[in-house]
Amino acid sequence: MGKGRAPCCDKNKVKRGPWSPQEDLTLITFIQKHGHQNWRSLPKLAGLLRCGKSCRLRWINYLRPDVKRGNFSKKEEDAIIHYHQTLGNKWSKIASFLPGRTDNEIKNVWNTHLKKRLTPSSSSSSLSSTHDQSTKADHDKNCDGAQEEIHSGLNESQNSATSSHHQGECMHTKPELHEVNGLNEIQFLLDHDDFDDITSEFLQDNDILFPLDSLLHNHQTHISTQEMTREVTKSQSFDHPQPDIPCGFEDTNEESDLRRQLVESTTPNNEYDEWFNFIDNQTYFDDFNFVGEVCL
């Protein structure tokens, strides 16, 4: 048989369940006469078929004369809350600070009323602490945001000053850049593969692009005009000889002056008009017979 406390009674021979009024009176009478020095032997001495533990609990919790009946006062509840925070669930020690209250009553009132009453307050306290923490976090966040705004404002001011400085430098170098860009555009046009297809009015003016060709063309036209003038003069002189002018006549001063003006003129269209006007003003004789040497 293992070691341990010996049972106080034979459980097969004891009575269980609620106490009767007769049993309560027997216990009260015995304790008032003899006291309760030994709860283990008290049931046999009092003639009760109960366990010693059951007799002790019945006396302490219900039958002793100083036991308080009724509800706990506000002062007693506050004392229970205070001692429970320091001692925990040690109900017998808590009962020693509350005269007339048993440990069982204190435990019952704690589990039934006080514990439920403290739960909302504790939750509210936890909520308040959480709210305080969130408020503090928001405050810190706002402070950080204000500091960031200050730093960003300083950075923007510095950036604006730097950009204005660069803009001033660009304004000083703008004419030079304009000239460089113009030269680059001209070089691009010269290097472009489709340069011949450009339909610019400037490029379509051949006199501007090729001034030497224009001068050469005018010179050739002027030479051809001179040759034509000579041929017409010869043919007119041969076909319609003038009176009093022998064959192989020499040019008159008026005709020489006109021819010299025609040679020196740079307007071919006016040369023809002046020449034909000169021919029309001459007097020819169709029936004039050449006498003498025939001009070949």
From Swiss-Prot:
Inactivation phenotype: Shorter roots due to increased sensitivity to excess zinc ions (Zn) and iron ions (Fe) deficiency, respectively. Reduced production of root-derived phenolics upon iron ions (Fe) depletion. Plants lacking myb10 and myb72 fail to induce transcript accumulation of the nicotianamine synthase genes NAS4 and NAS2 in iron ions (Fe) deficiency, and exhibits nickel (Ni) and zinc (Zn) sensitivity.
DNA-binding region range list: 39-63, 91-114
Gene assigned in the entry: MYB72
InterPro entries on file: Homeodomain-like_sf (IPR009057), Myb_dom (IPR017930), Myb_TF_plants (IPR015495), SANT/Myb (IPR001005)
Pfam families documented for this protein: Myb_DNA-binding
Keyword set, alphabetical order: DNA-binding, Nucleus, Plant defense, Repeat, Transcription, Transcription regulation
SUPFAM superfamilies in the record: Homeodomain-like (SSF46689)
Keyword Acyltransferase assigned: no
UniProt-annotated stretches for the region Disordered: 118-144
Keyword DNA damage listed: no
Subunit note: Interacts with EIL3.
Protein name: Transcription factor MYB72
This protein's GO CC annotations: nucleus
Compositionally biased residues, Basic and acidic residues: 133-144
